[in-house]
Amino acid sequence: SGANVARNTGIELATGDIVAFLDDDDIWDADYLEQHLIAHQQADAVLSGFRYLGDPTNTCINPIETISQNVIKKGNKFCGMSGASCKTEIAKRLKFDVELKNSQDWDFFVRLTLENVKFVNIPKDIYNYRRGHVSISTEVKNMPISKVYPRLLPFKKHREFLGHRAYGDRVSEQVLSFIGNKSNKLKWIYVCYSEAGFVATWNALVIRRVIPKLLRIKKRNTM
């Protein structure tokens, strides 16, 4: 069971030249498939932007049009699988990793770039993405430490691809996300140190969190 099993079943049954993916709670625009087909005239795989369902002014549109290995190393800043399509022959060869519980889309996109396919992005919001009932911040805040280890598997799988610095950045951001809302902060910091190393932990905690927060406080106090 699970999304990746369902996607793989769809890929196995696909008979057309291109396969597109749609989660059951998201909604494509009327011309979504048309725009992807146009992009596929010059590409093997295509992504596109989205807007949040019920909040049409809140969009996620990445201006980058060519998706390279260096771009995807920084994470999936494009869309989920509801914004993705791919040539069927490539999808049948790659399939989705059913062992992963998160970052399945990023894992698939990484493997597309490793295939050196022509991978492009449509910098428009052409589908509606539905948020879950439980916010990500609430879910992460209440997550026990034991639950974070499975979330690191995609990064460990692609550790060589990421390289030392990007690997540390991805792991530290996953472990320390919403650290201000978590209990047992020292335990979370220790897990980050154990998994990502001192430098990555320092950068994520101090450089990207503590210092910007102090600067914002200083700015407010001087206004």
Task: List where the protein language model places each region.
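Glycine-rich, basic loop-to-helix element that forms the pyrophosphate-binding segment
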Residues: 1-14
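Flexible acidic/His/Gly-enriched loops in nucleotide-sugar-dependent glycosyltransferase catalytic domains
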Residues: 5, 33-90, 139-141, 165-166
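Acidic donor-diphosphate engagement hotspot in glycosyltransferases and nucleotidyltransferases
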Residues: 7, 28-33, 104, 108
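Short aromatic/hydrophobic "clamp" motif used to bind/position activated sugar donors
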Residues: 19
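The conserved acidic donor/metal-binding loop of glycosyltransferases
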Residues: 23-27
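Conserved nucleotide-sugar donor-binding catalytic segment
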Residues: 66-146
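Catalytic core of nucleotide-sugar-dependent glycosyltransferases
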Residues: 125-132, 138-166, 186-194
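Membrane-interface aromatic/basic loop that binds lipid-linked glycans or pyrophosphate carriers
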Residues: 178-223
